[in-house]
């Protein structure tokens, strides 16, 4: 399923090509690209659920204390290792993620089929969430920079 999400993001969203809105056409395109029907359905459902998070009816996206600290469930820790959780905290500290967008990212990660997520895949999920969350254009650009810009030279000496 994640491969399909990446395919859609890279070929339609990120490349700024007009996105096919007809689900049947999109399904046919993905089938021609070699993806299995069951995985296509899961990926499209994942995207629909991401869009539904924007409606604001999700309780954990509404009420929060600015000074609260996120405690991960065991299932979340199984899927997001220490490096991934640390990266999410880093993104919050540099204001790429808000409490709401962080929770959206975690929600979308937990819906993926993968038993554990690597950091590179998490970065793409963050990018997808920010792209689909209105008012986060600046955060999206910052996240793009974190993904695509490679540092010159060594970070530590």
UniProtKB/Swiss-Prot annotation:
This is Protein Smg homolog. Transmembrane segments: none annotated. Belongs to the Smg family. PANTHER family: PROTEIN SMG. It holds the Pfam family DUF494. The gene is smg. Signal peptide: none annotated. HAMAP family: Smg. It comes from Shewanella sediminis (strain HAW-EB3).
